Amino acid sequence: MFNQEQGTDYPVLNKKKLESLANLKLAMGGHEYPTDDLTQQGLKLAGPLLEEVEESEVNHTTAPIDARLQTFLNSYFAECGEEVPKIPDDTFILDREGLGRVLSFPPHKQEFFCETMKSYKIKQGVLHNPAKDKRTTVGVFHICQSDVPVPADKIECPKIAFLRMLKAAFYGAPDDHLIIPYTAECKEPTRSWVSLYMRPVVVPGVKGVKGFEHEKATEMHFFVPGNMVSCLDFVESVFGNAGNPRLSKNDAALDPLGWTGHSGMAILAPHLTRMTKKECGLPHISQATERQKRERMCWEKEDELYNDGKTFKMYCRDASGVICTIIADNYFGYCKKEVKTQISYSANLYGFAEEEHAGGAIARPSYDLGESCDASKYAEGYKFSEMVEKNKHSIIVKEEGYAVDKKYPEGIIYVPEDSVFTIEDASIKFNHNGKEESILLTPKVNYVLPNGYTIILHDTMTSRRWTLRGILPQYTLCHKPCTVSGGGKSEISKSIRDAVIEGSVFVNNKEEDFKAVQKVFDHDFSKRYANGEVKPIHILDPNVTLGTVVELLTPSHLFTKEHNDYISSISPLIVELVMTIKSLYREDWKGDWQSRITVDKINGNEGNELKYRGANLSSQYLRVGFERDETTWRVFQLRKDFFPAAKLQMEDDITASVIVPTKLLKTPINNMQKKACKIVKNCELRLFQRPDDAVFRGFDKQTEYDFSIPGHFISNYQPMTREEAKDFTKDVVRLYQYTEPMRKCLQDFVAGKDEAKYIVSSSYTRLVPEGDKLVGSKNPRYLQRRPDMLDPEYTYMTFKAIQLYRKISDEEPLYTPVDAVLSGRRNNPPQVAKNGMKLRPLSVFAPLHYFELPELLMECITSMTGASPSMFGAGSEGALTKGPFNSLPAVVDLNNYLLGMICCGYSGFVSSASYCGPHYKVAHDISLLIPEIWSKMIRYEQEPKYLIEHGYLEPCPDVTYNGKTYSGKRLGYRITTAFANHFLRTLFSMPNSVMPEDFLKPELQDLAIYADSYEYMSQTDKGIAMNYVKDGTVEGACPPLKALIYIMANGEYNGMTRESKEFREMFDPEVVLNSEWYKERLVTRQKLEVAKLNKDLAYLNKTIAEKPRLAETLNKQIAAVKEELQYVSSEEYLHDINGSIGTDPYPYKCMKH
């Protein structure tokens, strides 16, 4: 079965071998090749080519995917009465990973320039700057007429126009577009199409669960003119390479249990922007329909260009399972989003699954445990002996009584539950067979308790000291779907560590300040509560946690006025000293802390910088937005025991998810009481990152590290020659603002330590025109290797900890479904975009909102956004932020999303990016904070009911301005001061200072802007909903969604409003899951799968008849398919999939056959 992450079974080749292979392929095709390297080395690499010749598929047989695509095209366009173009079968196939990168440059040149791209070999890899530095979504997406309606937010294209575009794409590409850069310096450059075959994942596999066990992929063939081969290098880097589509072993239809049954094609053809409307077959305006006139799909003058000569993507699809796309541009974002579109298309037709515009991460709480700890309190109820028994296949037990991991013996050590860790003597001590054993405590080793609790000897984020870091095995998988561009999808999985600032701990006057601290320690806290006294509490008591101290010194509505006044009277400096001393204090000090904390003598006088054990004490601070001037940072002190959550990225942008009934799972999960759960998988192998904060030198440490190592694919940065880099690095002060890796990379390049001719800096983006000047691009990009794949030991350790905590054996399946749904919105004050367009404000959102299902669906239907660096303009990104990239009616996605939320019982939260209200700029600071907060919340604290009952969430209030009242119901619930004080205390020393009242209540910042934002949102809600009514796709919506859309459009539906009890009951899980329309979805899934499996059997038998040599392999497939068919045809299957989302029947009902 094909695996996207593993790719083909051919070994990875280095650049020299790839050049040899390229030469061999060119020679076999009768083309000139640019080097003399056609040697025995090259012939050794001919395996794949000789395999093709053996099968006689190169010259005589069309690739199976192309045959499927051609059959579809011939049928689809038969009514047009014109020749259907033949898919080219003589393309240069990129059948080995890395071949596209080699073909992107002449072998002896370090740059390649053409009409559509400027490309450079750089020290860090390759830099490609396409003609446009960003994509637009306005007027771009065109869909060919078919039985399935074309949504109103897309432009409807007549079949004849698509057919003629297809001909012009393949037959009319300019000669210079077809030149393969690798051969550009040859006397006779090779002019050819280049193609890449891919199998992107659509449905994640769920181990051990019948009917869900097999991961399923779609298949896609991507064609580009030769000089755009870098686009295929990009796409391959993100989605992988499925080999040569002409080989039987790569035929998706011969891997039936791993294939959704869907096929796709994409063609890059920027030259099509020169075609006229008349050439395309569009009607004269006098013969055009009203829709064609409205969408300008007609002409008055014969020289009018199609789509006014601007970029467009044109889809041709129906519900049969084949999709073809023409893209009249070569910006990398369009290429990536096209694969996303085809994954989404396949997911919506197949069922069970969703393609989601999402980020996400597993976040585990992490704490500073100090210089010693007794680990027994962290592993209660777990025994080392039991852990050994359940993990006998993955660990090796040592005679001293500890164990090491078989896979990572140097980095993962398992220790007994009674272990005592001490930094002072670098030891871990425990009892074994009646005697004390001891092993060395060393850095960079995961010491794992029987319950998965992990302790690491860590140099702290400050220079204060070495410490023990404890990481809990309990986790929260934060899932950020339906998140607009710039809404924080990537940031949710980034470590907050890069945003942490270090600073020393100071005193004004040691003697006076220490007296003030002692007064706090001596204070009587027993009278703090308004509802009565509690027993006295002493801050330095070892049983009093640092969290309790933060609570004692944070104002609260639960406290008396006198206690709140007392807290307010303590200066921030004294509070910081209290926290510092509490974090260091040990019981054996017996109250004498003052002699342990010192200052140096400077010129005979006491200094101001505190020290402990000879080292400077430090504090950590975190930025949470900016002041109103939008340049001054709002910085707050973190707790003394703060460590960032241990995060493992699970998603970044394109996610495949599957809803699985909980009853089918073989081992426990976090929320077993839920009817179903969502399993997610990242569809991408590399992440197309936009490192916004890298323009601040030294701030984005990850990007600066990435830019210091080779092998990267980079775009929209400014290339520098050695001389330019020399000038760039003369400013020593600014040079040393970079972290060491980026600084050293620049210095080494200037010193001429490598052959590279060009380099880029992480802070110096591509210069693009803006009016009459050049400015840095706001859309710099690079492909980052997925962190979970880059550090497999950390990934393994994360899942191992969870497995141990759940007491699962190492042979049983481990499931880590979504725990929290935390979408993101990008907000903005009123402003003027770079393209001159005036942007209305979107300033009604607080840092975090909770929405009940109807309002959450409204958010998802409209998906409003402020301006993003990725795109021109702002407004609605369409349903679930996927509007531009959904080739089927959006109601299919919305039906799936609504049903998934209901089946899984998830609650919908939405966080803010860019701004909170019109005056607080927050960038991505809230997105970084949310996983830190959520990971430390107890499971019941994450539930809206609990948060509302305890005053942590409040209904958004109705607001009146100029005599008009704006209902707060549309905005759901928002976090309160109580939420900030209570939950931020797990992070900050003084949580009450982080989110002031007007930060949490945007209407207090500027009521006029708030009202205008609300008007804008309401108008957009209505306008978007009216589109579903106009194009008729509202009839494909499930009953609760259909009612909501009509209410958004008209204010009511069958006498119901949004507040009507009858309407809101339509979203009740019991009502939904017992409805006839839900049962129809399950039956549809069964019927489709039975039909597909029968079709698979026929294809397998046909292939055996044509190629008897494949009989042994394919007979095994036939047996597996027959077994699956028997199960899928049964009543048991229908019972088992109850709780899943089934398959939406709407697209199939649209088909006339």
From Swiss-Prot:
Subcellular localization(s) per the UniProt record: Cytoplasm, Cytosol
One GO cellular component term: cytosol
UniProt entry tagged with the keyword Lyase: yes
Enzyme Commission designation: 4.1.1.38
Main location: cytoplasm
Record keywords, A-Z: Coiled coil, Cytoplasm, Decarboxylase, Lyase
Recorded coiled-coil stretches: 1085-1131
Transmembrane domains' residue ranges: none
Catalytic activity: oxaloacetate + diphosphate = phosphoenolpyruvate + phosphate + CO2
GO biological process, one term: protein heterotrimerization
Family from the record: Belongs to the PPi-type phosphoenolpyruvate carboxykinase family.
Task performed by this protein: Inorganic pyrophosphate (PPi)-dependent phosphoenolpyruvate carboxykinase, which regulates the carbon flow of the central metabolism by fixing CO(2) to phosphoenolpyruvate to produce oxaloacetate. Can also produce pyruvate and diphosphate from phosphoenolpyruvate and phosphate.
Subunit description: Monomer and trimer; forms heterotrimers with PEPCK1 and PEPCK2.
Name used for this protein in its record: PPi-type phosphoenolpyruvate carboxykinase 3
Natural source organism: Entamoeba histolytica (strain ATCC 30459 / HM-1:IMSS / ABRM)
Gene it is expressed from: PEPCK3
